[in-house]
């Protein structure tokens, strides 16, 4: 009787634990939420933390001498640690002076031994001080002639961080081939970067943007082509794809008023303009148009719950490490539920 009692009690405990786990389900695979230091990002983290297992705090940059600048969002880091969510510090070459990513700034730090060492040493200090799990290097608009220099830089930094048990993730623009004529993506040698980085975050968003003609922010076939190229050059278990939590609104007549539209903003815009969204089969994305008070026609491209779920599932299809979301702050739970369904 005692044996059967023990079995019965064990079974009951197992059922309770299963139900608890089901209610507090965590993200499957790697799900990274990019955050800033603002209140909206923090609120999203506290609301939707069960849908992610890592955050990347996009609050750091650097100067031409390699000096790291920026502040650690302590509230977010404290909360993430409490919830056992891994944290990454994003270091970008964004330059406030020019309101853009600065290829020359990146080149300076990559080519100058003193600046490179200072940059790397300070990354280690930063990670140790704030208990970051890893460093996410996000150098964008790297100069085309710096392709080899950037690969060598990633090798140098990754090896230095590895010695201190700090992980390295590198963000790269999405591409389906190495094209010397593509100044934006050519500088990133996937194979060499993937050899030394622990993870490579492929930015599978911004296929189109307000800097160009209207179109899908992340069409299905474009993502597929990018992931196919990525896993040929990089081990699949190192690759992370990107999911946009935003869309773009193009003013067809006056491009200067074109703007980004956050996830939560889109539904209210549709309601306000009495727009009729349509699914674009070719891109696998949503689109609609409207006319504003100035009689200007606008074209909007975005993702909804269904398309987010479909595109998130590509992470499973290509057996990659996971997904990343850019960015926390103005998304809803329905967005996160779509990612969870897609990555299951």
UniProtKB/Swiss-Prot annotation:
Q: What's the domain of life for this entry?
A: Bacteria
Question: PROSITE patterns annotated for this entry?
Answer: GH18_2
- One Pfam family here: Glyco_hydro_18
Report the top EC class in one word. Answer: hydrolase
Give the EC number(s) listed in the UniProt record: 3.2.-.-
Instruction: Tell me the first and last residues of the signal peptide.
Output: 1-27
What gene is this protein a product of? yvbX
Picking any one GO molecular function of the record gives: hydrolase activity, acting on glycosyl bonds
Q: Which UniProt keywords apply?
A: Glycosidase, Hydrolase, Signal
Query: What region holds the GH18 domain?
Result: 29-344
Q: Which PANTHER family match?
A: CHITINASE DOMAIN-CONTAINING PROTEIN 1, CHITINASE DOMAIN-CONTAINING PROTEIN 1 FAMILY MEMBER
Active site residues per record: 140
Which family is it part of? Belongs to the glycosyl hydrolase 18 family.
Q: How is this protein named in the record?
A: Uncharacterized glycosylase YvbX
GO biological process terms on file: carbohydrate metabolic process
Gene3D superfamilies, sorted: 3.10.50.10, Glycosidases
